[in-house]
Amino acid sequence: MTAAVKSEISQLPVTRTCCRKAEVSAVLRFAGGLHLVSGRIVIEAELDTGNAARRLKRDILEIFGHSSELIVMAPGGLRRGSRFVVRVVAGGDQLARQTGLVDGRGRPIRGLPPQVVSGATCDAEAAWRGAFLAHGSLTEPGRSSSLEVTCPGPEAALALVGAARRLSIPAKAREVRGVDRVVVRDGDAIGALLTRLGAHDSVLAWEERRLRREVRATANRLANFDDANLRRSARAAVAAGARVQRALEILADDVPEHLAAAGRLRMEHKQASLEELGALADPPLTKDAVAGRIRRLLAMADKRASDLGIAGTDANLGEEELADNLVG
């Protein structure tokens, strides 16, 4: 969904000058680099979408008054898609100071500029919008869903976490294989942040996919639960049939007919539920009556086996059936 979000927010109209400044500052901080060429500062920002690059080029001119060139780099090598480089040569040193890339003495600033860090809520939103356009990604809703931004260093990461905090968004700075990242994992927080960025269509798509996944996961859990219960019930019925068979062997002819009849039903219909066994009885019985008769049959046989010193009704059961040693 990354491309959809970037496409949407790169076309978002922003009228407040402070917000446009904050967004440009963030894009240059997270996607840019400073180079010294013949003693002068040259600024470059490399982006992965043409819309974001054109937006940056326009704002640099309209807000800061500097011209820039847009260079398209075709896919090749490790680059899977085209890359778009916005380069400012004339006035690069002035733009670097205006956007907070360097301080008044020309020393690099590693985080976000003070006017963004201490600005209004809209500036925090704009900073996040710029950072996401520069190096953001959004994964599909799921167990490992996340919205994250790759940062040029820990100072920029902490500044972005602070901006998220001002928006009441829980974000964490992490270093993964030597790369600083800011990550938002909570599904509700991701939806709230996308709304703050102005990606309203993307929020709807995100929430729809998230809901669909949750419904599917719930259905799978219920299906697994039902399957497990069915398997457990089937094993229990088979185990009960094996115990009844052993009980009738132990008691031989010395067993009341109504108990023997219930036992024979269990043996003849090993997969049937107690309710189904009751319906098959003549006359029909309730499931509690069937269960009671089978319990009494087993108890009588186990007592006789104990008196005779022989194996009881559990003798015919395997390990799994012993674990499910129920009537049915």
Curated annotation (Swiss-Prot):
Effect of mutating L160P: Aerial hyphae have coiled segments and no signs of septation (strain C85)
InterPro entries named in the record: Homing_endonucl, Sporu_reg_WhiA_N_dom, Sporulation_regulator_WhiA, Sporulation_regulator_WhiA_C, WhiA_LAGLIDADG_dom
Keyword Nucleotide-binding attributed: no
DNA-binding region ranges: 273-306
Induction: Transcribed both as part of an operon and from its own specific promoter during sporulation. Transcription is stimulated by WhiG.
GO molecular function: DNA binding
Inactivation phenotype: Cells lacking this gene do not sporulate; instead of aerial hyphae of unicellular spores, long slightly coiled unseptated stalks form.
Transcription regulation keyword on record: yes
GO BP annotations listed: cell division; regulation of sporulation
Superkingdom in the source lineage: Bacteria
The entry's keywords: Activator, Cell cycle, Cell division, DNA-binding, Repressor, Transcription, Transcription regulation
HAMAP family: HTH_type_WhiA
Subunit and partners: Monomer in solution.
Family note: Belongs to the WhiA family.
UniProt xrefs under PANTHER family: CELL DIVISION PROTEIN WHIA-RELATED
Entry note about domains: DNA binding is primarily driven by the H-T-H domain, but requires full-length protein for maximum affinity.
Function: Involved in cell division and chromosome segregation. Involved in sporulation. May coordinate the cessation of aerial hyphae growth and subsequent chromosome segregation and/or septation. Required for expression of the ParB partioning protein during sporogenesis. Activates its own transcription and represses WhiB. Binds with low affinity to its own promoter and to the Parp2 sporulation-specific promoter. Also binds directly to the RNA polymerase sigma factor WhiG, leading to inhibition of WhiG-dependent transcription in a dose-dependent manner.
Protein name: Probable cell division protein WhiA
